């Protein structure tokens, strides 16, 4: 007989809700950072210009999860897999050409790098590497491309950093396009997080005198004949239609994303005096079959440019409702089974995969679903070991294009024999400030945990309802503070 969940199951709409965040962090530029990481720009627009990376694959939904083996450069990700950290989720990041990724301006000398954490692990250190002056940007990233002496090392001192942290570093002299590799070595696992940062030296100001970056044409999707793509140009008063450039999709060739991006950039350069579009080549703006930055003339009074679409055929909406997933399942003699109910909105292919914390797949299911269909699904796990697990859902349209991906977290726990009074000192978190080395508590999973000796005993008191990483038995880092009795 299968084990029943210990807690009441809850329903979650995957299109808008994700589970508890167990991992982990990415290079950002929210407050002080000089440049965002490659993976960050897959999900978030660049600060100041609105530029984004495209065609990143599933990692665009989880930029915090570029995690791989630690020990770089002696060990760590293989050459050619450095940007992805050998994660299949991030494989698209390993593509490397001179014009593939958005580049952020930077200058040599003192600069600030910023990390944003979704789970702020105990940290060993952060290291920053940069490509050699003569590196080849059209070859996969390898150790030979980098100066393997880090230009900046920040000690983590085996403590948790805040959810956002800044590092002051001295960036070496370079010219043109370079890649910075930021490595966050966490202290409580055998893994590190790898973020590459695409930068261009020589300027935080305008790329040409009198021209300022103001937007980007991102070839994010194919269009259909009859659709229109256009610029939305803004001044101090808001959108100014007088500066709009429209491109009607009137041929099969123009339906392809890279084709209409090139054509729209070309039309801007032909028809607008205060706007230019394309990659900078010397003193010229050259449209490309890919992402085209947009620039505005200094003194024009124009502030920014966005891209709009007039779609003749409305785009379908997709969502998947999953109910029946519990927060905890107790391990027993029979395999663990997840009894789920799915409800589809839109014609889709729904995929479910269960992973343990080490990313090993334990169960999977996929099937086409029609709009409004209800389906009962049972996933039987191939193994059951106590700890954190994830249910990953993917929604694809009938052409196989990924529409959404979400991750929900749950725990597998060992069966517990109820302890007798006197076997423990407190019911956690009662008496929190009295916890010292050797204190025994009864945790929410029904087990007894003993506070570790110094220097780890201080973690036992580090708990609030909003910071539960050291909560005995269920926190993401409980083993740093407690021994299970």
UniProtKB/Swiss-Prot annotation:
The keyword Secreted applies. GO terms for molecular function: chitin binding. It is found in: Secreted. Gene3D superfamilies: 2.60.40.2550, 3.30.70.2150, chitin-binding protein cbp21. SUPFAM superfamilies: E set domains. Residues 24-201 form the Chitin-binding type-4 domain. CDD domains: LPMO_AA10. Residues 437-478 form the Chitin-binding type-3 domain. It comes from the Bacteria. GO terms for cellular component: extracellular region. Residues 1-23 form the signal peptide. The keyword Metal-binding does not apply. Its main location: secreted. Keywords: Chitin-binding, Secreted, Signal. Probably interacts with GlcNAc residues. May promote attachment to both epithelial cell surfaces and chitin. PANTHER family: CHITIN-BINDING TYPE-4 DOMAIN-CONTAINING PROTEIN (PTHR34823:SF1), GLCNAC-BINDING PROTEIN A (PTHR34823). Belongs to the GbpA family. This is GlcNAc-binding protein A. It comes from Vibrio cholerae serotype O1 (strain ATCC 39541 / Classical Ogawa 395 / O395). The lineage of its organism: Bacteria, Pseudomonadati, Pseudomonadota, Gammaproteobacteria, Vibrionales.
């Amino acid at each position: 007989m299968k084990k029943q969940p210990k807690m009441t199951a809850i329903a979650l709409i995957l299109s808008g809700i994700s589970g508890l965040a167990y991992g982990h962090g990415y290079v950002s530029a929210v407050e002080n950072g000089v440049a965002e990481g490659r993976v960050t720009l897959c999900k978030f627009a660049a600060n100041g210009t609105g530029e984004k990376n495209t065609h990143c694959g599933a990692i665009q939904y989880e930029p915090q999860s570029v995690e791989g083996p630690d020990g770089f450069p002696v060990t760590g990700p293989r050459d050619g897999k450095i940007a992805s950290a050998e994660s299949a989720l991030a494989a698209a990041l390993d593509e490397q050409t001179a014009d593939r990724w958005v580049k952020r301006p930077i200058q040599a000398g003192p600069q600030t790098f910023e990390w944003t954490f979704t789970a702020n692990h105990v940290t060993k250190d952060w290291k920053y590497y940069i490509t050699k002056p003569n590196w080849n940007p059209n070859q996969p990233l390898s150790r030979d491309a980098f100066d393997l002496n880090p230009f900046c090392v920040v000690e983590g001192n085996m403590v948790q950093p805040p959810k956002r942290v800044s590092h002051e570093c001295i960036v070496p002299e370079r010219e043109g396009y370079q890649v910075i590799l930021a490595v966050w070595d966490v202290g409580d696992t055998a893994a590190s997080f790898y973020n590459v940062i695409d930068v261009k030296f020589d300027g935080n100001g305008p790329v040409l005198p009198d021209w300022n970056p103001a937007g980007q044409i991102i070839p994010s999707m194919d269009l259909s004949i009859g659709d229109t793509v256009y610029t939305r140009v803004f001044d101090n008063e808001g959108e100014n239609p007088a500066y709009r450039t429209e491109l009607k999709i009137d041929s099969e060739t123009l339906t392809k994303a890279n084709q209409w991006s090139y054509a729209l950039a070309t039309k801007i350069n032909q028809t607008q005096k205060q706007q230019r579009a394309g990659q900078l080549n010397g003193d010229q703006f050259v449209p490309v079959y890919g992402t085209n930055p947009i620039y505005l003339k200094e003194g024009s009074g124009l502030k920014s440019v966005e891209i709009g679409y007039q779609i003749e055929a409305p785009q379908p909406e997709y969502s998947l409702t999953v109910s029946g997933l519990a927060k905890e399942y107790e391990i027993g003699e029979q395999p663990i089974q997840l009894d789920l109910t799915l409800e589809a909105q839109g014609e889709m292919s729904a995929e479910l995969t269960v992973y343990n914390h080490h990313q090993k797949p334990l169960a999977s299911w996929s099937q086409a679903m029609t709009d409004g269909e209800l389906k009962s699904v049972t996933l039987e796990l191939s193994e059951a070991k106590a700890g954190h697990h994830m249910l990953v859902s993917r929604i694809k349209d009938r052409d196989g294009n990924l529409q959404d991906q979400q991750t929900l977290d749950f725990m597998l726990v060992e069966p517990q024999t109820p302890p007798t009074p006197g076997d423990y000192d407190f019911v956690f978190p009662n008496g929190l400030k009295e916890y010292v080395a050797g204190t025994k508590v009864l945790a929410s999973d029904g087990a007894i945990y003993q506070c570790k000796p110094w220097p780890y005993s201080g973690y036992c008191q580090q708990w609030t309802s909003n910071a539960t990483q050291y909560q005995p038995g269920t926190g993401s880092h409980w083993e740093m503070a407690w021994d299970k009795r």
